[in-house]
Amino acid sequence: MAVIKCKPTSPGRRHVVKVVNTDLHKGKPFAGLLAKKSKSGGRNNTGRITVRHVGGGHKQHYRLIDFKRDKDGIPAKIERLEYDPNRTANIALVLYADGERRYILAAKGMQAGDKIQSGVEAEIKTGNAMPLRNIPVGSVVHAVEMKPGKGAQIARSAGAYVQVVARDGAYATLRLRSGEMRKVPVDCRATFGEVGNAEHMLRQLGKAGAKRWRGIRPTVRGVAMNPVDHPHGGGEGRTSGGRHPVTPWGVPTKGYKTRSNKRTDKYIVRRRNK
């Protein structure tokens, strides 16, 4: 994997930094694991904007990823690594011994030809998945479930991982990258190793158009709007906003705590680092 800084042959190329991975498959994705992906433009079923800064972008297919890793006891081989436009991580096409193919997240160091397996009898090796009750304390894992059988929800983006720091009774304690310590049922599954493509954080798009290709629309500052559009809007000439920073709906921002899920508070041993 190489990080390439483009020559400044134009203003749009001057700040571009690319991450090039020559190991990725250059052809089309596996058709049997693709699904239609419709664009919403950030609108809900009534046509109103519910997510700002969304719209346009290149047409994409969704890749059906196996986040459950529940095909136990059947060895599999990594056929190839692929780019996935729907996530920061790369994905791997896996061929099981019974002929089935699935996509999984590509772990750090994973290559075509590697052998992987799921289940309690799998060895401790990058890419293998098993319940947390069978994973040694101190192990680094990714693609961790929060509810048994629901599918991975934690540590799925490029370079992400969590560490198993303790196991007591029905729960295992995980240390997340944010510093948060969280309890998860020991029957939840996780995959050994880190998510690959950690160099993704080094890339620079270099121009506004590259954001638009990805379906990301501009972000307008509140102080540049009219009073009807934002609490910071209006005024004669340039203003500072005149109040503490708030969202367009008047909720304080920049450090204001908004977490209100008391039902799951008991699973958080320590809040994330500030």
From Swiss-Prot:
Official protein name in the record: Large ribosomal subunit protein uL2
Record's keyword annotation contains S-adenosyl-L-methionine: no
Keyword set includes Ribonucleoprotein: yes
Family annotation (SUPFAM superfamilies): Nucleic acid-binding proteins, Translation proteins SH3-like domain
Organism: Shewanella sp. (strain W3-18-1)
Family recorded in the similarity comment: Belongs to the universal ribosomal protein uL2 family.
GO BP terms, alphabetized: cytoplasmic translation
Record GO terms (molecular function): rRNA binding; structural constituent of ribosome; transferase activity
Cross-referenced NCBIfam families: rplB_bact
A matching Pfam family: Ribosomal_L2_C
PROSITE patterns reported for this sequence: RIBOSOMAL_L2 (PS00467)
Gene Ontology CC, one term: large ribosomal subunit
Assembly with partners or alone: Part of the 50S ribosomal subunit. Forms a bridge to the 30S subunit in the 70S ribosome.
Domain of life: Bacteria
Signal peptide residues on this chain, from the entry's feature table: none
Keywords, alphabetical: Ribonucleoprotein, Ribosomal protein, RNA-binding, rRNA-binding
InterPro entries: NA-bd_OB-fold (IPR012340), Rib_uL2_dom2 (IPR014722), Ribosomal_uL2 (IPR002171), Ribosomal_uL2_bac/org-type (IPR005880), Ribosomal_uL2_C (IPR022669), Ribosomal_uL2_CS (IPR022671), Ribosomal_uL2_dom3 (IPR014726), Ribosomal_uL2_RNA-bd_dom (IPR022666)
Biological function: One of the primary rRNA binding proteins. Required for association of the 30S and 50S subunits to form the 70S ribosome, for tRNA binding and peptide bond formation. It has been suggested to have peptidyltransferase activity; this is somewhat controversial. Makes several contacts with the 16S rRNA in the 70S ribosome.
Location of region: Disordered: 223-274
